[in-house]
Amino acid sequence: MHLKKALCPALCTFLIHLCLHAGERTVPVDIFLMIDKSRSMQEPGKFSSLHRWVRDEFVSSMTIQGDWITVYQFYEKPEELITLTLRSEQDRDKIISVVDSIVPNGRYTDIGRALDTVWEIQEKRKDNNRHKVLLLVTDLEHDAPLTSKYRGKQRSFQSPYLVRARRVKHDNWYEITLDMAVHDRVAHTARELYRSIAAAHSKRPTPTPPAKESSPRYTPSLD
């Protein structure tokens, strides 16, 4: 039962992703697209390839009318570029125009902050009974400034958000479908662990303090 609960969110994410690629989807979803525009994306096989995929494959072929979509670009910090409900080809053209305007020139790459932002914006729509497609497209090269809580460099960024993520490699970048439910599972596990520790501590018998030794009474000599 626990295994089934753990696999369910990841399986739902995979099935949504499969339907997107298969062109068989008829039910609109919420799409959160985060695009890496840092300088490392200027390298061969990165942004030019990523741009073509986002523009010609994802936006043009994998979205349907009724989809709600928000597009962000990120480097040091994420920036919202466009948010709309797709109702016509004109709306699709608006998204493509925004994607065409992205230039990979950001000095830093704070992937941790980008992931936090995805989680925050999807939380605002979590109760609308729509499936969520959370996409991060990046080379995973992390280089955050000293002002970031994720400061430092990582050749391939590691995060709890990415543990159950589905990664598809394209040339020298990755299409990553995120499972943000892992955030809630980690928090729940931490709370349960704390409760277990607290309960175990409360059941421990209180140690009895050792009895104090009485000092010998002084008896004056009668001699």
UniProtKB/Swiss-Prot annotation:
UniProt xrefs under SUPFAM superfamilies: vWA-like
Identify the residues that the record assigns to the VWFA domain, covering every copy. Answer: 30-204
The alphabetized UniProt keywords are: Signal
> Where is coiled-coil annotated?
none
Signal peptide span? 1-22
Instruction: Quote the Pfam families the UniProt record gives.
Output: VWA_2
Where is the stretch described as Disordered?
A: 199-223
Alphabetized PROSITE patterns for the sequence: VWFA (PS50234)
Q: What name appears for this protein in its UniProt entry?
A: Uncharacterized protein TP_0750
Which species does this protein come from?
Answer: Treponema pallidum (strain Nichols)
